[in-house]
Amino acid sequence: MTFVLDRSTQRTRRGDVVIGGSPLRLFRLAPAGTAQFDRLAAGDTVGASKLVERLVDAGAIHPVPDAGAGPRQTGTLTAADVTIVVPAWSNNPDLDPGAWNAWLGTLPGGAPVAGVVVVDDGSRPPLALPPGVRLVRRARNGGPAAARNDGVAEVTTALVAFVDTDVTVTDGWLDGLLGHFADDRVAAVAPRVASARGPGAVARYEAAHSPLDLGPEPARVAPGTRVGYVPGAALVARTDAVRAVGGFDPALRTGEDVDLVWRLIAAGHRVRYEPGVVVHHAPRPTWSGLVRQRIAYGSSAALLARRHPGTLAPVRMSGWTALAWALLLAGRLRLAALVVAATTAALVPKLGGVPAATSVRLALTGHAGAGRQLADAARRAWWPLVAVAALVSRRARRLAALAALPALTDGGLHRLLDDAAYGVGVWRGILTTGELGPLWPQLRDWPRRQR
């Protein structure tokens, strides 16, 4: 299998130190590892090794799926090993069965899949599907988790592909994902879910800011990393792995897909994000619909934090970086500058073998990235606290204005509305459950060293 370097991955001039991944990690290479990394960086085919495994798990390199042997090769899976499961619900009595038939016909993307299972999740009136469609009817609506679980119960193939009814797939979409399953540790792979383009301001905004669109860069998926989750709107998974972790949790009406992905990862599996395959998700038709969606997404944060402690932290940074920003926000500029200078200087010997200029750049980049996280948190999970502080403090008002600037320059007032709606959902979940996890920052060392 061949690999590409993550955008964060860089190598020192001597060639025996690699820094990369999410969060950043430092790898010291022996001579054999240096030679192997040369081949990785050149795009040559590389077999399984401990170095490859560590770099993949760190998110420092990403596999390029092909028909060749990958790490831990178990055989090639094809579209014939895939059953597509569609959770469906509608309260529209005029829904056209012909339109259903046309949409269902696109799901295989031109590939000969084993079958398609539609789960009618208590629609009123019941969905009228074309003859020949494999249909499971639920007596009452149980939500997408319950519907997907009923679909999985019908699956006899090695892989199951979940596709929501508001998703449009492209030809060959399965072929672009199946190669990842050459690695037997991979339990699930998700494509990029871009927002479908359309007329109107909402569609234009969603095209650039959909929470389902995780960007153009490949990633290993893990909580607290650059790509911390993937949506279940389009997801291909090993059927046995899904069953082994208990399937989707029907108690979650939103966030059930994130919960499943994190349980797969906790069970020792890998989950991959493959943006080389793009499907399209229908945007909300109105601003009120978008706000309701974002509130629903935020509402799942508290329950997810209770199930997966530490995963929903609004900011992640080192303790020294947190101190520097706390001093800066308190107006103690000289002390903040002193902490930044001291921690930057201390990082140079810690990263022995890394050029001083590189160490300084990493330290300053880390401090700046923490500032962006703080601004995001101030607009999202923390905004009610910021708003209260702004009522009584001129400094808080200035800081709130600074936190709003990144959003205003990338989406304008609509972005502020988006962030605030998510924050409303977070607080709704907190008040309902009493779980404060989505508010607490997480402090950690950076970068970690790997040998």
Regions found by a protein language model. Name each.
Residues 101-139:
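Acidic donor-binding segment of Leloir-type glycosyltransferases
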Residues 172-204, 282:
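Conserved donor NDP-sugar-binding/catalytic core segment of glycosyltransferases
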Residues 55, 231-237, 241-246, 251-277:
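A short, conserved alpha-helix in the catalytic core of glycosyltransferases
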